[in-house]
C-alpha cells in the first residue's frame, strides 16, 4: 500500500504509568498527618480528585480524615500567614489631645 493512501496512524509510544499517591499499605486515617498533608493546598484547602489522581472511594476517605483532623484541631481550617504577622502598636499618650491645623 502506498504511504499516501494509508490511514492516519498514531505512533505507538510507550508510556510509564505514574505510581498511585496512596500505596496499598497506607492507612487513610485522621492521625496519619504525613499522608493527609499531601492532599492539602498551601492555603489548607482539600485538593480535587483529578489533581490528586485518587479513586472516588480514596478521595471520600481522605476528605473525611481531613475534616476529622480539623475538628480535633490537628489541622488548621485555613493557613493564614497574615494572621501570624504582628503589626507594631502605636504608643498611647496620656496627656491632653491637641488638634493639628
From Swiss-Prot:
Stated name of the protein: Small ribosomal subunit protein bS18c
Gene Ontology CC: chloroplast; mitochondrial small ribosomal subunit
Region (Disordered): 1-26
Gene Ontology biological-process annotations: translation
Pfam families tied to this protein: Ribosomal_S18
Keywords: Chloroplast, Plastid, Ribonucleoprotein, Ribosomal protein, RNA-binding, rRNA-binding
Family as reported in the entry's similarity comment: Belongs to the bacterial ribosomal protein bS18 family.
Matches recorded under PANTHER family: 30S RIBOSOMAL PROTEIN S18, SMALL RIBOSOMAL SUBUNIT PROTEIN BS18M
Keyword RNA-binding included in the entry's annotation: yes
Family matches, as InterPro entries: Ribosomal_bS18, Ribosomal_bS18_sf
Gene Ontology MF terms in the entry: small ribosomal subunit rRNA binding; structural constituent of ribosome
The keyword Ribosomal protein is annotated on this UniProt entry: yes
Predominant cellular place of this UniProt entry's protein: plastid
Subunit: Part of the 30S ribosomal subunit.
Subcellular compartments: Plastid, Chloroplast
Feature: compositional bias, Basic residues: 1-19
Amino acid at each position: 500500500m502506498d504511504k499516501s493512501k494509508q490511514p492516519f496512524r498514531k505512533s505507538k509510544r510507550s508510556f510509564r504509568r505514574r505510581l498511585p499517591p496512596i500505596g496499598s499499605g497506607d492507612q487513610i486515617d485522621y492521625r496519619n498527618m504525613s499522608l493527609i498533608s499531601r492532599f492539602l493546598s498551601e492555603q489548607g484547602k482539600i485538593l480535587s480528585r483529578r489533581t490528586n489522581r485518587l479513586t472516588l472511594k480514596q478521595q471520600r476517605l481522605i476528605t473525611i480524615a481531613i475534616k476529622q483532623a480539623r475538628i480535633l484541631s490537628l489541622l488548621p481550617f485555613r493557613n493564614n500567614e497574615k494572621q501570624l504577622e504582628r503589626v507594631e502598636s502605636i504608643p498611647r499618650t496620656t496627656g491632653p489631645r491637641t488638634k493639628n491645623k
